[in-house]
């Protein structure tokens, strides 16, 4: 799909994978969740799970950006990468054994331009052992927020401000996958909880990725109704 008002230089989004960390594969959800963002003559791959080990090189990304260190998001880099890899300090700490040589740090709430595309990391609640971030991604007149794993966004209003698309967590549609470990929460917010965030912050389109199974029209019928100002897409 393409974004932006400039038809001569649009931002292109390619969903390379939409599957979560589960054994079940379907035709639509075959590879671990990953998004390729292309702008001008460069492409940045967001996340590179174990499914992509030995395969992602054929995509020739100019850079890779990681949301967190879980196997389905980062273990495709176990043997290294032929391009720069950007991640938070907490993620690099968990990936100490990965053979990535060209490592770069992304600081939370500090916009960073990578291959002409601006990435701003926002802390999200998801895991204690592998702390995660979501990314506000912008280039030209296009802006999206990508967060395949989360319970909630710590600074949601700033993260979603003027975003055209919210790409969120499809691990569960309506049942909560949130658990408590000590004083911390871990797990996944249901899609049912994420849609009101988009409505409140005025995001016109929500795309759900990181699916646990094939999403049917019957399942989506049980979700809160999208308003006239918001469109829901199940990937």
PLM regions and their residue ranges:
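Short amphipathic alpha-helical segments
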Residues: 57-59, 76-79, 97-99, 158-160, ...
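A short helix->loop->beta-strand "cap" motif at the edges of active sites that frequently abuts
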Residues: 42, 81-84, 200-206
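Active-site metal-binding motif and surrounding structural segment of the metallo-beta-lactamase
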Residues: 44, 49-87, 162-166
